[in-house]
């Protein structure tokens, strides 16, 4: 074997354009944190569902990429996006169609084996699958029409609202909700009837925020895995028996997205599509609503928030200035925020790594502020 040939080939690679090393570090880091939590908290059982979901998700994703290629489910890149993204055109998409069901099956199996199965898990499973289906319809239309646009914004919001209302009716009828919102420390605010419209807004906002974040290889899957892990740890620390099943749900979701990340990091071999991103955001919002961790989710999901706010600012300022002075002004080079940094010349992997690091810092902050 010509070892010199392989060594020279390795040296010639631009490792800054490969997200595998940092993805492996992220996976190892979350595994180590889960081990520490399990060792120091008696009832914590994070490691087994985490490892299981990582392995199974990675296997299913590898198999799924082949299937997606066979049925020609490939990404269509929008013309107005960054020019560097045109090379991503043709990458298999709709990867979330494998990850979401697998994570839900594993979650419910773990819950049944640990006698922690609950109505909350049923509600979360419904919410995740329903939003996945909305994303699936959107992705399928985009692929069949061969354009980077599936459902209209209006249609998507209507479907998300209908599912959100069904979910809220479900948790109300089963008395799974708490209209007291926990903020700093143990301080609470009772929202009363205001809780329900706010809850619906959070479902729509979070699902669309993760959708906007899914614009760089490994960005949404990495950030999502970190936030799910943070929520799982917070719920374990609380020590409430009712929250253990939800903590298991969170860590299984984290593991599933980490397994997916192995193939979604740069250069991505598959994208999650709206099928995955909408389900991810809805799941995070659902967990927060059921476990009174809305404030924690707001802090932990700072990247999701920043991505959404950047779009709101960009569109709002552009339309306002165009109406007033006849010419639209752009605050950012392009929105969402990650595209702004891309056009500034920052490499995609560097943006993703920095956004992961920011998410980790804010997850730690949220846990310390609980």
UniProtKB/Swiss-Prot annotation:
PROSITE patterns (alphabetical): MRAY_1, MRAY_2
GO BP annotations, alphabetical order: cell division; cell wall organization; peptidoglycan biosynthetic process; regulation of cell shape
Enzyme category, top tier: transferase
Disulfide pairings: none
Cofactor field: Mg(2+)
Catalytic activity annotation: UDP-N-acetyl-alpha-D-muramoyl-L-alanyl-gamma-D-glutamyl-meso-2,6-diaminopimeloyl-D-alanyl-D-alanine + di-trans,octa-cis-undecaprenyl phosphate = di-trans,octa-cis-undecaprenyl diphospho-N-acetyl-alpha-D-muramoyl-L-alanyl-D-glutamyl-meso-2,6-diaminopimeloyl-D-alanyl-D-alanine + UMP
One Pfam family matching this protein: MraY_sig1
Listed CDD domains: GT_MraY
PANTHER family from the UniProt entry: PHOSPHO-N-ACETYLMURAMOYL-PENTAPEPTIDE-TRANSFERASE, PHOSPHO-N-ACETYLMURAMOYL-PENTAPEPTIDE-TRANSFERASE HOMOLOG
Family: Belongs to the glycosyltransferase 4 family. MraY subfamily.
Its job: Catalyzes the initial step of the lipid cycle reactions in the biosynthesis of the cell wall peptidoglycan: transfers peptidoglycan precursor phospho-MurNAc-pentapeptide from UDP-MurNAc-pentapeptide onto the lipid carrier undecaprenyl phosphate, yielding undecaprenyl-pyrophosphoryl-MurNAc-pentapeptide, known as lipid I.
NCBIfam families assigned: mraY
Protein name: Phospho-N-acetylmuramoyl-pentapeptide-transferase
Upper taxonomic lineage: Bacteria, Bacillati, Cyanobacteriota, Cyanophyceae, Synechococcales
């Amino acid at each position: 074997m010509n070892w010199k040939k392989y060594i020279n080939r390795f040296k010639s690679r631009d490792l800054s354009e490969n997200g595998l090393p940092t993805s492996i570090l992220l996976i190892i880091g979350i595994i180590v944190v889960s081990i520490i939590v399990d060792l120091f908290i008696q009832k914590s059982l994070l490691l087994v569902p985490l490892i299981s979901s990582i392995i199974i998700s990675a296997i299913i994703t590898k198999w799924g990429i082949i299937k997606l290629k066979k049925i020609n489910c490939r990404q269509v890149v929008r013309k107005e996006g960054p020019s560097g993204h045109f090379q991503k055109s043709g990458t298999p998409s709709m990867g979330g169609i494998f990850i979401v069901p697998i994570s839900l099956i594993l979650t419910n199996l773990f819950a049944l084996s640990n006698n922690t199965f609950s109505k909350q898990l049923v509600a979360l499973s419904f919410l995740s699958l329903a939003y996945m289906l909305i994303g699936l319809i959107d992705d399928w239309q985009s692929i069949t029409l061969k354009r980077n646009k599936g459902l209209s914004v209006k249609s998507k919001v209507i479907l998300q609202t209908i599912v959100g209302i069904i979910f809220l009716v479900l948790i109300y009828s089963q008395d799974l909700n708490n209209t007291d919102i926990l903020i700093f420390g143990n301080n609470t605010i009772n929202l009363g009837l205001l809780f329900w419209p706010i809850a619906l807004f959070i479902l729509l906002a979070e699902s669309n925020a993760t959708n906007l974040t899914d614009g760089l290889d490994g960005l949404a899957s990495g950030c999502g895995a970190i936030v799910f892990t943070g929520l799982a740890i917070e719920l374990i620390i609380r020590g409430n028996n009712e929250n253990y099943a939800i903590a298991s749900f969170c860590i299984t979701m984290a593991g599933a997205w980490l397994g997916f990340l192995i193939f979604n990091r740069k250069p991505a071999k598959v994208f999650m599509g709206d099928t995955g991103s909408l389900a991810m955001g809805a799941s995070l919002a659902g967990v927060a609503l059921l476990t009174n961790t809305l404030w924690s989710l707001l802090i932990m999901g700072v990247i999701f928030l920043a991505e959404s706010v950047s779009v709101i600012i960009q569109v709002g300022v552009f339309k306002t200035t165009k109406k007033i002075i006849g010419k639209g002004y752009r605050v950012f080079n392009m929105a969402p925020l990650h595209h702004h940094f891309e056009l500034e010349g920052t490499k995609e992997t560097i943006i993703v790594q920095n956004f992961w690091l920011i998410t980790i810092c804010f997850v730690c902050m949220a846990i310390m502020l609980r």
